From Swiss-Prot:
PANTHER family cross-referenced by the UniProt entry: PHOSPHORIBOSYLFORMYLGLYCINAMIDINE SYNTHASE SUBUNIT PURQ
Catalytic activity: N(2)-formyl-N(1)-(5-phospho-beta-D-ribosyl)glycinamide + L-glutamine + ATP + H2O = 2-formamido-N(1)-(5-O-phospho-beta-D-ribosyl)acetamidine + L-glutamate + ADP + phosphate + H(+); L-glutamine + H2O = L-glutamate + NH4(+)
Alphabetical list of HAMAP family matching this protein: PurQ (MF_00421)
Quaternary assembly: Part of the FGAM synthase complex composed of 1 PurL, 1 PurQ and 2 PurS subunits.
Record-level GO cellular component terms: cytoplasm
Protein's recorded name: Phosphoribosylformylglycinamidine synthase subunit PurQ
Source organism, top-level taxon: Bacteria
Protein keywords: ATP-binding, Cytoplasm, Glutamine amidotransferase, Hydrolase, Ligase, Nucleotide-binding, Purine biosynthesis
RNA-binding recorded as keyword: no
Length: 228
């Protein structure tokens, strides 16, 4: 698997994400600039957390106009795998690559803590190394992680199996306890929890490693289940 992490001005999880993919999961991973317009060399493109362009206007609202986003839309339309984490999730919704939107947390506070998740769909490119119903603990760190969608969209997400991760104890008010969703075709995932911060036992746990192992399995056919 060859992956790329888009490093926007204000991204602060890009190096963590590259480390998780390259050093821990053992795949190739480049940092690329938001001016890049050709993504055809990659199997997976990752949009990291942080505060892209200072989160002015609202989270992700400016980043979506970067030249790389037009290339990312083409990449996704061609079937390439895209994952947006935290601010990356916000950017993907702003760009129209994922349904719904991220609002201010229910209590209007920034939340930074580990949270319990449940795996809802283990049949995606991002979750095939987990089991349905498996319980995970991943860190969150966001002020605008409250997932919102209209009733029709929520119904479609549930019917189509697009909800991949769900909060066990909803920390931010997200509708249907949604922590991570895919697009309708299943090749784009957005999630608020940070899997790249949960890949080393020394730092608190390895529950996030399965996200990257799943992508390796999907792109290379190399089943690495059990390595966690």
């Amino acid at each position: 698997m060859k992956a790329a992490v888009i490093s926007f001005p204000g991204s602060n999880c890009d190096l963590d994400l590259q480390w998780a993919v390259r050093a821990i999961a053992g795949a190739e991973c480049d940092l690329i600039k938001p001016t890049q317009t050709d993504l055809t060399a990659y199997d997976v493109v990752m949009v990291p957390g942080g505060f892209s362009y200072g989160d002015y206007l609202r989270s992700g609202a400016i980043a979506r106009f970067s030249p790389v986003m037009a290339a990312l839309k083409q990449f996704a339309a061609a079937g390439g795998y895209v994952i947006g984490i935290c601010n990356g999730f916000q950017i993907l919704t702003e760009a129209g690559l994922l349904p719904g939107a991220l609002q201010w947390n229910r209590d209007l506070n920034f939340i930074c803590e580990p949270v319990a998740l449940t795996v809802e769909n283990a049949g995606t490119a991002f979750s095939n190394q987990y089991q349905v119903g498996e319980h995970l603990t991943l860190p969150i760190a966001h002020g605008e992680g409250n997932y919102y969608a209209d009733p029709e969209t929520l119904a479609a997400l549930e019917t189509n199996g697009q909800v991949v991760f769900r909060y066990a104890n909803n920390p931010n008010g997200s509708m249907h306890d949604i922590a991570g969703v895919t697009n309708e075709t299943g090749n784009v995932l957005g999630m608020m929890p940070h899997p790249e911060r949960a890949v080393e036992a020394l730092l608190g746990g390895t529950d996030g490693l399965g996200v990257f192992q799943s992508l390796i399995n999907q792109t290379e056919g190399a089943d690495v289940r059990g390595a966690r």
